[in-house]
Amino acid sequence: VVTDPNITIKDSDKNNVVKLFLGISRGRSAYKGTDIMWEAARDICKKYPDKISLRVVEGLPYHEYVKAMKDADIILDQLYSYTPAMNSLQAMSMGIISMGGGEEEGYEIINEKELRPIINVEPSYRSVYTALEHIAQHPEEVTMRRQQSVDYVRKHHNYVHVAKQYEAFYNRLVISK
């Protein structure tokens, strides 16, 4: 994933509305948990209309989708995953927090001991709702998680770093033959 080397994360104002983003891909909604996340987000927005907003997009071309996502603080993605997928990683590279799969096992696999940018949720309405309510009540956490999101992608998913890992793996295979 490519990250903007000049990206800066501004401090969140406690009075700012936390902006949620949900991209819908109709053919994939059922196995991504979009329906559950959407319902929880709608309910939180009703309860905290002055603290949380939700933008939902559907069927956009990729470049328009990325542009639409830019103003978000949090992307709702991959409820049934243990780790962030490419959509979340792209968002995280832009300083957007991922809410979805962020299990400890995922951090252990990549030996990440400090960064915890992802708002990990279990695959249930209650878990998503509770996590969103926490953010509504603690918007001061947004700035830290946004910065950690960028740091996480730079550290573990930078395209040059990943290419070097593939090259090293390939060379080990070739040498072992």
Where are these regions (language model features)?
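Short alpha-helical segment that forms part of, or immediately flanks, the ligand-binding pocket
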Residues: V66, S88-S93, Y107-E108
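Acidic, amphipathic alpha-helical patches
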Residues: Y62-Y65, A85-S88, P117, V128
